[in-house]
A protein has these predicted regions:
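Conserved short histidine dyad/triad with adjacent acidic residue
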Residues: 21-28, 40-55, 153-160, 170-187
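Asparagine-centered strand-capping/turn motif at beta-strand->loop junctions
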Residues: 96-99, 227-230
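A short hydrophobic beta-strand segment most commonly corresponding to one strand
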Residues: 86, 100-118, 218, 232-244
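Short, conserved beta-strand element in jelly-roll/cupin
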Residues: 41-45, 54-70, 108-110, 173-176, ...
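Structural motif
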Residues: 60, 67-69, 76, 92, ...
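A short, N-terminal "cap"/entry segment at the start of jelly-roll beta-barrel domains
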Residues: 1-36, 116-168
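Fold-core signature of tandem repeat domains
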Residues: 50, 85, 95, 156-159, ...
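Short acidic-glycine-tyrosine-enriched beta hairpin
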Residues: 74-89, 206-222
Length: 244
């Protein structure tokens, strides 16, 4: 299996139709050579639903564009761009696009071959705006998440980490201003970088890749890279890696 980096365009042909109007594109998985990591996008047309299901691993869900409702055992959370929610192993959840516009999600699993079991929706709906210690899921709002500086002009915040209850994956969003460059040291595990908004030039050794919204690049373990924002507008990238 080829272990080189791999670029996937956000407008590539869908790999799977998970439900009517829901298209899945795999950025990396066991079938593409990734170890312990699957990252993909889900494009949801208005009015579409991913029915209730569970996974034998946790799942990290973040919003690249649009608005969706994520239901976790009946608890309904409305997520917008750069919001994220972690759903632990075995917890039933569903996603609906109740808006009038297409939504694009970014999903991550700590396995090369995620499985799911679909369930009946027998849950009473409770609208919530946040999570707390009484529920197993963990919601991160992009607007209010705690930021930390990677360089004076570059900030990031976590979606999935030990503090959010994530198991086997870690990552979040990094905001890179115009003309700035983020050096990313080599990791001992595989990772994936996806553009939420803006344009990026990613350099790995002597290779350069130009990415725009919803494009993604698989980065194998042991490879360092840098992300440059070549434009005069902001760049948001979601970086997720497997844990050791």
């Amino acid at each position: 299996m080829n272990r080189d980096e791999k670029l996937v365009r956000g407008d590539a042909d869908a790999d799977v139709q998970l439900a009517p109007g829901v298209e899945i594109r795999f950025f990396c998985s066991g079938s593409t050579g990734a170890n312990g990591l699957t990252v993909c996008s889900a494009t949801m047309a208005p009015g579409t639903v991913i029915p209730y299901h569970t996974h034998p691993t946790g799942e990290g869900i973040s919003v690249l564009k649009g608005t969706v409702s994520v239901f976790v055992e009946g608890r309904r959370y409305e997520l917008h761009s750069l919001d994220a929610i972690y759903v632990p192993t075995g917890i039933a959840h569903s996603v609906k696009n109740e808006s009038g516009s297409t939504a694009t999600l970014h999903t991550s699993f700590p396995t090369g071959s995620p499985d799911r079991e679909f369930l009946e929706d027998n849950f009473a709906v409770e609208n919530r705006s946040a999570t707390d210690a009484t529920v197993p899921e963990y919601l991160v709002r992009g607007a209010t998440a705690t930021r930390r500086s990677l360089k004076p002009e570059i900030v990031c915040w976590d979606f999935f980490c030990e503090q959010t209850g994530a198991v086997g994956i870690q990552g979040g969003n990094t905001a890179i201003p115009p003309a700035a460059t983020l050096p990313c040291p080599a990791l001992a595990t595989d990772s994936c970088i996806a553009v939420s908004s803006g344009n990026a030039v990613v350099t790995i050794q002597d290779q350069q890749y130009e990415l725009t919204a919803f494009d993604a690049l698989f980065v194998p373990s042991g490879a360092s890279y840098q992300v440059h924002n070549p434009r005069d507008s902001a760049l948001d990238v979601i970086r997720v890696s497997a844990c050791e």
